[in-house]
Amino acid sequence: MDSGVWAACIFCLLSSLPVALGHVHPECDFITQLREDERTCLQAADRMANSSSGCPRTWDGLLCWPTAGPGEWVTLPCPAFFSHFSSEPGALKRDCTTTGWSEPFPPYPEACPVPLELLTDEKSYFSTVRIVYTTGHSVSAVALFVAIAILVALRRLHCPRNYIHSQLFATFILKAGAVFLKDAALFHSENTDHCSFSTVLCKVSVATSHFATMTNFSWLLAEAVYLTCLLASTSPSTRRAFWWLVLAGWGLPLLFTGTWVGCKLAFEDVACWDLDDSSPYWWIIKGPIVLSVGVNFGLFLNIIRILLRKLEPAQGSLHTQPQYWRLSKSTLLLIPLFGIHYVIFNFLPDSAGLGIRLPLELGLGSFQGFIVAILYCFLNQEVRTEISRRWHGHDPELLPAWRTHAKWAKPSRSRAKVLTTVC
């Protein structure tokens, strides 16, 4: 097998691997580097054409062979990419004969081996992950649509807390739609070269994906901020705070995404805008996300501290099993609502831990919207009570007063009022 066929086999497998974690698969770096090496090699060959006797500078599909005199042997190492598959660096030799360059020795498959079956298995693995996250986002979108419809249709559930839940639900739906749009743009054909693919639809899908991701993180943060203010506030009025959260939750992601799009158009308008690992402009998107996850985690710990204090008996410390259960239940409910699981990978490089990161962030993460809809709508006692009242036609006048008004307990020792019911 000559170098051209060997390079074509590798390109065919690598360029068809799916996009992972919102970025082109790392092997695309190898293909991009090869294309840059080819361009440099051919430009140098054009400048040196007919400048000397012997063998001219030549690109064979993987390596650039320099000019050489008759009878001269040239040795070059395998491209750096092949070191991932072999502990010993390979090398090739070519002889400059009177009739031109000889064939590389040893042949490329022997000098620079690549387990093609491994790449095939990797492609199959990514396809499976894609099926899982497509299913997850689809299920989540349907559940979230139903949850929003319930919160909007039942007027007794109209309150700032549920308004914020609805905004968060909407961001999960937007995120699912962005994933479907991106997949449609990138994977509409099996023959598409994902490493160099570049269309307006592709760039729009990537920008939409970034905006959806940022809005999702911003409303996860809004949930944490709102609950913190609710637990610590001395005033039951929260509607003004809600509108500030709306402005920040949608406005800031739009501002950062618009800035990123402007920078890409002006300074880095290449490929499909998803080669971001080495781009300084990527931090316009990633920086606010990392910051929001860090702040969210801090607020999560603070809320657990507040809950621990409020569950503490007057005489002593928390020690009874029911109180431990209440605290554990509250903590577990906050994890999907605040997206605390993102702390695990959010501070690592995008290419780190792909083997674990893909199933967790793409697989389980796609079901996060479904879990949030279940916990904060379908299993919510107020929602179930209101649906039951509507279903059985109960007279609203017979409902207890706490169903329609906010009730505030007396100040605790810490002088913070405890909200027992919001709606």
From Swiss-Prot:
It is found in: Cell membrane. Pfam families: 7tm_2, HRM. Disulfide bonds join C41-C64, C55-C96, C78-C112. It comes from the Eukaryota. InterPro entries: GPCR_2 (IPR050332), GPCR_2-like_7TM (IPR017981), GPCR_2_extracell_dom_sf (IPR036445), GPCR_2_extracellular_dom (IPR001879), GPCR_2_GHRH_rcpt (IPR003288), GPCR_2_secretin-like (IPR000832), GPCR_2_secretin-like_CS (IPR017983). It is a multi-pass membrane protein. Residues 1-22 form the signal peptide. Residues 152-167, 232-240, 305-331, 379-423 are cytoplasmic. Coiled coil: none annotated. PROSITE patterns: G_PROTEIN_RECEP_F2_1, G_PROTEIN_RECEP_F2_2, G_PROTEIN_RECEP_F2_3, G_PROTEIN_RECEP_F2_4. GO terms for molecular function: G protein-coupled peptide receptor activity; growth factor binding; growth hormone-releasing hormone receptor activity; peptide hormone binding. Its main location: membrane. Receptor for GRF, coupled to G proteins which activate adenylyl cyclase. Stimulates somatotroph cell growth, growth hormone gene transcription and growth hormone secretion. This is Growth hormone-releasing hormone receptor. It comes from Sus scrofa (Pig). The gene is GHRHR.
